[in-house]
């Protein structure tokens, strides 16, 4: 799950299937989001997000966050997930995630259906 936003009122979670490592030195990863996704506009503006790894225990939340829009619901509240302050960026981490990776956007590559 990818979390983003600058303040609790804006916090959102997107379920992202297309992600991975693209460089080890310097460490860099990627996510691929449809332009229509609510999180796309937040991340494009704030230039930061958190990759929150999931477990089997988070399967329901991961699925639900992938089919609901953050424009209409507070995903943290609806799924009983806890937003916690990230040490280095404003985007929140998901406390229930076993591993959270803070990310700053270096480049947005426009690629048709996804960026």
Regions found by a protein language model. Give the residues of each.
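Active-site-proximal mixed secondary-structure blocks
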Residues: 1-15, 20-115
